[in-house]
UniProtKB/Swiss-Prot annotation:
Database matches in InterPro entries: Cys-tRNA-ligase, Cys-tRNA/MSH_ligase, Rossmann-like_a/b/a_fold, tRNA-synt_1_cat_dom, tRNAsynth_Ia_anticodon-bd
Source species of the chain: Roseobacter denitrificans (strain ATCC 33942 / OCh 114) (Erythrobacter sp. (strain OCh 114))
Residue numbers binding Zn(2+): 29, 225, 250, 254
Pfam family, one: tRNA-synt_1e
UniProt-recorded name of the protein: Cysteine--tRNA ligase
Cell compartments where the protein resides: Cytoplasm
Motif 'KMSKS' region location, chain numbering: 281-285
């Protein structure tokens, strides 16, 4: 079955035909490294990690290149260094490692060039300044960029298709602009390729304009990805991915400057939708903002974070809720029990592969997994079930036995399930005292117990206390 992917550029689902099946190439915009990755930052990493795994499964690990950058030169980084009194190098090195650790915790493979070179597949912007300067000089020579007051700007009117990716016209963009336009811009929508740096700001020798350097400065955000993608993947590559919030202006600007530099750039553009928390936009002002590390430190396993993310299709808004987290922990606990002692057969279920090949339909894949779980009886069933989980990036820490948080979370669910079972048994024997005592104990530990004619169900409330639960053993 052919992989089908929704292409933002054409606004339709298309058969994916790589330029070269022996060298499938994908670029995904990475983080600006000045702080911890919040939960929304994890969504594109997880989404495109699933695509990376699918491409590796389809074409072979040695035939897929996946590049994801780090932006380590940015005004936010400069501001963080100034307010903290620490060096930029120290901050970017620390936050880069934080990101790598947190994304590994949610099961993301490191990007790699044909399964051989991880470091080059995770380029830092500061390593590619020379390539950026060369591209800027080329754009100036071709009449697509101009120098003004120490800046170099891209002239959007020189590119007739500007706005095609996001479906915007230049006139509408100008009319809707609410920020003051710099007086040195020829057009309000022209964007910065290079900007001057003072003595307190990182800087490099700038592009040569009219036979001399424009002066010390630093690159604009958009030129970074174009230069790194071109250097590592070539003038034309297969897939470019990122969050929906990057479609404009970042990806729109990438396309404009790359095309005008003579590069066809990416054939397929993919965007994941944004994340909400309990139905609301995640923000510090609403008190619902948290990082991936916050969840991990609270004992939420990375496998659970990943599972919740994959339960919603990547092109739909993802709503993170406590209920979904609890349901994910219960499901993964049962699946872990099934696969204890299993060995990967390297034969994932074909139905799951078909779901993933249909524009990464992970919700359908998970619904099929629920059915396969119920049907699994033989060792071969369990081995194939584990193989399928591994294709989705789930179950690797179970097999390696290294994730303490996962084990603790599953032990918690196991204890609650055992206590619920004792309530059901006591009620069947009309031992109301034992039933009430156990239920009261669970309630005091923050576990809400509901008893109905259909049986006993439970969910963890906001006051859940693991220590009180442990005391009920």
């Amino acid at each position: 079955m052919t992989i089908k992917l929704y292409n933002t550029k054409t606004r339709r689902k298309e058969d994916f035909e790589p330029i070269n099946k022996d060298d499938v190439r994908m670029y995904v915009c990475g983080p600006t490294v000045y702080d911890r990755a919040h939960l929304g930052n994890a969504r594109p990493v997880i989404v495109f990690d699933v695509l990376y795994r699918l491409l590796r499964h389809t074409y072979g690990p040695d035939h897929v290149t996946y590049v994801r950058n780090f932006t380590d030169v940015d005004d936010k980084i400069n501001a963080r260094a100034a307010e903290s009194g620490r060096s930029i190098a120290e901050i970017t090195a620390e936050t880069t490692q934080w990101f790598l650790d947190d994304m590994a915790a949610v099961g993301a493979l490191e990007p790699s060039i044909k399964d051989r070179d991880h470091q080059r597949a995770m380029p830092r912007a500061t390593q590619y300044i020379a390539q950026m300067v060369t591209m800027i000089e080329d754009l100036i020579a071709k009449g697509h960029a101009y120098a003004a007051e120490g800046h170099v700007l891209f002239a959007v009117e020189s590119y007739s298709k500007y706005g095609a990716l996001s479906g915007r016209s230049i006139d509408d963009m100008i009319a809707g602009a609410r920020v003051e336009v710099a007086p040195y811009k020829r057009n309000p929508m022209d964007f910065v390729l290079w900007k001057p740096s003072d003595d307190a700001t990182p800087g490099w020798a700038g592009p040569v304009v009219g036979g001399k350097s424009i002066g010390r400065g630093r690159p604009g955000w958009h030129i970074e990805c174009s230069a790194m993608a071109h250097d590592l993947l070539g003038a034309t590559f297969d897939i470019h991915g990122g969050g929906n919030d990057l479609m404009f202006p970042h990806h729109e600007n990438e396309i404009a400057q790359s095309t005008c530099a003579g590069h066809n750039f990416a054939n397929v553009w993919m965007h994941n939708e944004m994340l909400q928390v309990e139905g609301k936009k995640m923000s510090k002002s609403l008190g619902n903002f948290f990082t991936v590390r916050d969840l991990l430190d609270q004992g939420v396993p990375g496998e659970v974070i990943r599972f919740v993310m994959l339960s919603t299709h990547y092109r739909k808004p993802m709503d993170w809720t406590e209920k979904k987290r609890e349901e994910a922990e219960e499901t993964l606990w049962k699946w872990k029990k099934l696969t204890d002692g299993a060995e990967s057969s390297r034969r994932p279920h074909l139905e799951i592969i078909a779901a993933l090949k249909d524009d990464l339909n992970t919700p359908l894949a998970i619904s099929i997994l629920h059915r396969k779980f119920a049907e699994a009886k033989s060792d071969d069933d369990k081995n194939r079930f584990l193989s399928t989980l591994l294709l989705l990036g789930i179950g690797e820490t179970w097999r390696d036995g290294v994730d303490v948080a996962v084990e603790e979370a599953f032990q918690t669910v196991s204890l609650i399930e055992a206590l619920i079972e004792s309530i059901e048994k006591a009620r069947a024997q009309k031992d109301w005292a034992t039933s009430d005592r156990t239920r009261d104990g669970l309630e005091s530990a923050g576990v809400k117990v509901q008893i109905s004619k259909d049986g006993v169900s439970w969910e963890r409330g906001p006051s859940f206390d693991p220590a009180k639960l442990e005391a009920l053993k």
